[in-house]
UniProtKB/Swiss-Prot annotation:
It catalyses: (S)-4-amino-5-oxopentanoate + tRNA(Glu) + NADP(+) = L-glutamyl-tRNA(Glu) + NADPH + H(+). This is Glutamyl-tRNA reductase 2. GO terms for molecular function: glutamyl-tRNA reductase activity; NADP binding. Keywords: NADP, Oxidoreductase, Porphyrin biosynthesis. Homodimer. GO terms for biological process: protoporphyrinogen IX biosynthetic process from glutamate. The active site is at C50. It holds the Pfam family GlutR_N. Catalyzes the NADPH-dependent reduction of glutamyl-tRNA(Glu) to glutamate 1-semialdehyde (GSA).
Length: 413
């Protein structure tokens, strides 16, 4: 299979490293255009999240790693950056994507957000028309497989999102969060999820909002609102500050923060962004603790049974996709045979149609339904060959069937 991927994730790259691989939507579109027009790939899909940046290719005619280095890192990338990239091809890539959708390769084992991110990556590729039928089918199959795993196997135990994990770990380490004052900087999906989890714990929560987005914002019920430009006026009295924006500049910097702190008060800052929202030097302040998302990762312990069951179920979807991939070039031949059989059926039943007392509209409807039924029956039988024959055998049989069908057409005429 000429399917491949290249990328980095939290396993190979630290937060500091992952910052260099972050791709905006505009940058993703620019890269996809080059992959299609310059590297002549049949299709591509780009997945860019806080924990991973991956490019998926169909029919790429050059080195995946070289393509990634040139388009994402640039020619002046350090060798250490190049060394953390991972390439997967063929069966390995297909199996990896199936597992990825289930959360097996996520920091929070079994988390659900990766499935949403796969859907969004696929939809963006559709919207900008840089996905081909192969990657379309692969990602749809992976999404379907992940949904099946989620409903059939309990691979996640309790916390299936980063915000949930953060809340649980903060309670474990620092005690009850009831009544704690929290500021969430950022009104995107992660910010809203974090706010909702904090509200569930009966925290007093405020979210920042940029003035120009005020009318479009979705604020979880129970949360207060703070204008983004006024955030420093409120930070001083907060117990916890969470930052989850897509900004490429710091939302909290050391010089501003150290001047607004209250004497004798300790602060807990949680950075949920890549690139980071909180200036690293803030950690130098003695009364401040800064956490990043890597701190809250969940180790995979005692998951052998769930992993075995998941992989066994996923193997069915992997095989299903591989069969489709091998058979896809024969679909037009199957359609041709089905159409010929439909025409023959229609010709053979002409006298029967005329002998039945039906109106013209009823006769046309009956004729159309019979033709459709004939097409479906033939297609189903022929596609069933995939289960009993090798691909080369299927090709030979289809060629023979097509020739036979055409001969039948000649005799009917």
């Amino acid at each position: 299979m000429n399917i491949s991927m290249v990328g980095i994730d939290y396993n190979t790259a630290s937060i500091e490293d992952r910052e260099h691989f972050t791709l905006t939507s505009d940058k993703q579109l620019e890269i996809a255009k080059i992959i299609k027009e310059t590297y002549h790939a049949s299709g591509c899909i780009i997945l860019s999240t806080c924990n991973r940046t991956e490019i998926w290719f169909s029919e790429l005619g050059t080195s995946e790693a070289e393509c990634f280095h040139q388009l994402v890192l640039g020619e002046n990338a350090k060798e250490t950056m190049r060394s953390i990239c991972v390439c997967r091809q063929g069966d390995e890539a297909v199996t990896y994507l199936m597992e990825l959708g289930c959360g097996i390769h996520s920091q929070i084992f079994g988390e659900d957000q990766i499935l949403t991110q796969l859907k969004q990556a696929l939809q963006q590729a559709r919207d900008y028309q840089y996905v081909d039928s192969v990657l379309e089918c692969l990602f749809r199959t992976a999404i379907t497989a992940a949904k099946k795993v989620k409903t059939s196997i309990q691979i996640a135990k309790g916390n299936t999102s980063l915000p949930q994990t953060i809340v649980e770990q903060l309670e474990k380490e620092q005690g009850d969060l009831l009544g704690k004052s929290c500021l969430v900087i950022g009104n995107g999906e992660m910010g809203r999820l974090m706010t909702e989890k904090l509200l569930e714990k009966k925290c007093k929560v405020w979210m920042t909002l940029r003035q120009y987005k005020k009318s479009k914002a979705i604020i979880p019920e129970g949360s207060g609102v703070v204008l983004y430009d006024e955030r420093y006026e409120h930070i001083a009295v907060m117990d916890y500050i969470f930052s989850a924006t897509k900004s490429h500049h710091f939302t909290i910097n050391k010089s501003m923060f150290e001047n607004i702190r209250l004497k004798g008060k300790t602060y807990c800052l949680i950075d949920l962004a890549i690139p980071r929202d909180i200036e690293p030097s803030v950690e130098e302040l003695s009364d401040v603790t800064v956490y990043n998302m890597d701190y809250f990762c969940q180790e995979v312990n005692d998951r052998e049974k769930e992993l075995e069951e998941t992989r066994e179920l996923l193997s069915e979807y992997v095989n299903e996709f591989k069969q489709w991939y091998q058979f896809r070039n024969l679909v037009s031949t199957v359609d041709d045979i089905s159409n010929i059989v439909s025409d023959i059926t229609d010709a053979k039943l002409t006298k029967v149609y005329k002998s039945i007392d039906l109106s013209r509209e009823q006769q046309e409807l009956l004729q159309s339904n019979v033709q459709m039924a004939a097409k479906k029956a033939v297609s189903k039988i022929i596609f069933g060959l995939r289960d009993v024959l090798q691909i080369d055998q299927c090709e030979e049989v289809l060629q023979a069937l097509e020739q036979s069908a055409m001969n039948c057409t000649d005799s009917v005429k």
